[in-house]
């Protein structure tokens, strides 16, 4: 009997992602969500939260490299970094590729995600065991309130704006992040797909330009995410990632997606998507 995963995230809009499953490996329900792990035929090992694909071994690098290296390469000397969400460890792994980093705070509300990823995705998750990484299992929107003028870079590696992640797409959270960043600090947040989620993106850019010196949107290509595209909002109190010319000598070795050229290209949006964005 063939097994297939049908991702239901876009089902109400008449769209679905179907992935052939080789083996069902694990399932658990935490106080926050249901976590499932599969061995897929075409994308390697993968996990879902409440039936929505979060990561696969085959394409995770495209997301993790772009959420991290665009802000990190735009900042002249990122030493203190905050990752909100990101319990799979991929974002932390990429952050630690920058030798300037002295301290990484990982704020993941659901410890169950980290535990599952340690067991089933050790090559990705073990980066979270680095001694520079400080773990906090709490709401990221509350965590940032405890730090003022502290972080050089913040990456909000969140799920979609439902349930526990909904607050991470609201104005008060962005205002608190601005206070949390040092002068010259930069943050990036998971910004949905400009094909499917234009209304969410427009809502974000109704208030982000009022809070930050620079802001805008860029994207990456991930086959197992809705529409195959996932975007990021960037917000900066200092350098503008859109105009920064990355130093090729600072680009970490061994990357699969990010490069100095890709950094520049990621900001080029199709005309229909530009109407959702305010670049400042």
Curated annotation (Swiss-Prot):
It is an enzyme of class 2 (transferase). It comes from the Bacteria. Pfam families: Spermine_synt_N, Spermine_synth. S-methyl-5'-thioadenosine binds at residues 33, 108, 139-140, 164. One of its GO terms (molecular function) is spermidine synthase activity. Spermidine binds at residues 64, 88, 157-160. This is Polyamine aminopropyltransferase 2. It comes from Leptospira interrogans serogroup Icterohaemorrhagiae serovar Lai (strain 56601). The gene is speE2.
């Amino acid at each position: 009997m063939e097994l297939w995963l049908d991702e239901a995230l876009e089902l109400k809009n008449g769209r679905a992602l179907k992935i052939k499953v080789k083996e069902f490996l694990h399932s658990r329900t935490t106080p926050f969500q249901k976590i499932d792990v599969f061995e897929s035929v075409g994308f390697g090992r993968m996990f879902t939260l409440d039936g929505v694909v979060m990561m696969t071994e085959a394409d995770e690098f495209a997301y993790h490299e772009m959420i991290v290296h665009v802000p990190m390469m735009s900042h002249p000397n990122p030493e203190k970094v905050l990752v909100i969400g990101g319990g799979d460890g991929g974002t932390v792994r990429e952050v630690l590729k920058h030798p300037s980093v002295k301290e990484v705070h990982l704020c993941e509300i659901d410890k169950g995600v980290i535990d599952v990823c340690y067991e089933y995705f050790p090559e990705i998750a073990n980066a979270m065991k680095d001694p520079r990484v400080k773990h906090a299992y709490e709401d990221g929107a509350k965590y940032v309130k405890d730090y003022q003028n502290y972080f050089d870079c913040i990456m909000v590696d969140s799920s979609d704006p439902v349930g526990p992640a909904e607050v991470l797409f609201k104005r008060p959270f962005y205002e608190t992040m601005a206070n949390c960043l040092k002068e010259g600090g930069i943050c990036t947040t998971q910004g949905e797909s400009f094909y499917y989620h234009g209304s969410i993106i427009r809502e974000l850019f109704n208030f982000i330009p009022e809070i930050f010196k620079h802001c805008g949107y860029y994207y990456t290509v991930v086959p197992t995410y809705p529409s195959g595209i996932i975007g990021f909002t960037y917000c900066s109190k200092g350098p503008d990632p859109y105009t920064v010319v990355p130093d090729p000598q600072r680009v970490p070795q061994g990357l699969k997606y990010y490069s100095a050229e890709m950094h520049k290209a990621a900001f080029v949006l199709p005309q229909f998507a530009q109407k959702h964005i305010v670049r400042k």
